[in-house]
């Protein structure tokens, strides 16, 4: 079980700390603005809390935001409302729909695009590569494949690596 590779995405995984922090901040800024522009919940939430989404530019700024609880999420999706207010893409872009287990009440629903799946798979590919897995190795995924995005994207990552 030696793939000879230390990294799946060497450019990202060996990035200098300052560059990595800058990339994280850039992606946070993008994500917050995307949520504001595309999610009915976040558009209203930012307005109600007098938060200018464009001013959130770093991971430190996230610490200043009010917490959104699981209960808040449940209150902004069916059956409490007529729509999924957290959904931030149009229906044709939704690749899969998932729910949490609902152990603390009504399950919370979330939506993934194909691009989201690829990001999840990339995360698992980095993990597998860092542990020495590569072409010809085998991995046993002991998680449920039903609506568990982890099991499915681990398998996608393994396939990409030839495992």
Predicted regions and their residues:
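Short beta-strand->loop structural element characteristic of the AMP-binding/adenylate-forming
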Residues: 109, 162-163
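Conserved AMP-binding loop of ANL adenylate-forming enzymes
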Residues: 129-161
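Nucleotide 5′-phosphate-binding alpha/beta core
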Residues: 1-99, 104-130, 135
